[in-house]
A protein has these predicted regions:
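Conserved segment of the thioredoxin-like fold in thiol-based oxidoreductases
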Residues: 37, 87-141
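Structural cue for short, hydrophobic secondary-structure segments
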Residues: 64-68, 98
Length: 172
């Protein structure tokens, strides 16, 4: 009986850790979003013009919401994959909305230009206090969401070859 209690306690603790992850409830938010309609958010572009995610998502195109920042080394390393996907699939109905966790506007704009990212970019320039962090449970970057033409989140965290593999299936 004592052994059964120890085993059950171990399963309980493992489940609790898996659900809450390192940053509180963000793991719960992340997992619960796949299969759900996207949540709208509104942030300014590089010119200060406000845009809503609903201006792009749920409008008949596949949309990748890409969370990144100019100061993020892994984001810079991942960006060639994202750019290649954009160039390969944009004319077939694929759009990207970049959401930056930057706080310095000059660095943000410079990275967009130097990293060859020709899609729409949004940021409230609030670093980790970015509104998207709470809405989408972003606890690390790079991160992304793939939204189908009807506005349903179908995947999260597609990096490297995984992004192209999924998009090549969609657009074959």
């Amino acid at each position: 009986m004592k052994r059964l209690s120890v085993v059950l306690m171990a399963f309980f603790l493992a489940g609790a850790i898996a659900c809450y992850g390192a940053d509180g409830n963000y793991a719960d938010i992340q997992q619960s979003l796949v299969g759900q309609k996207f949540l709208d958010l509104e942030e300014p572009d590089v010119n200060g013009v406000e845009h809503k995610l609903s201006d792009y998502a749920g409008k008949g195109k596949w949309v990748l919401v890409d969370f990144w920042a100019s100061w993020c080394g892994p984001c810079k390393a991942e960006m060639p994959n994202v750019t290649a996907a954009y160039k390969k699939y944009h004319d077939k109905g694929f759009e990207i909305v970049g959401v930056s966790f930057d706080r310095e506007k000059g660095n943000w704009i410079r990275a967009i230009r130097e990293w060859d990212m020709p899609w729409i970019h949004l940021s409230d320039l609030k670093y980790w206090d970015n509104a998207a962090r709470e809405v989408y449970g972003v606890d690390a970057i790079p991160d992304n969401l793939l939204i189908d033409p009807d506005g349903i989140i179908v995947a999260r965290g597609l990096r490297g070859a995984a992004l192209d593999a999924v998009l090549s299936e969609i657009f074959k």
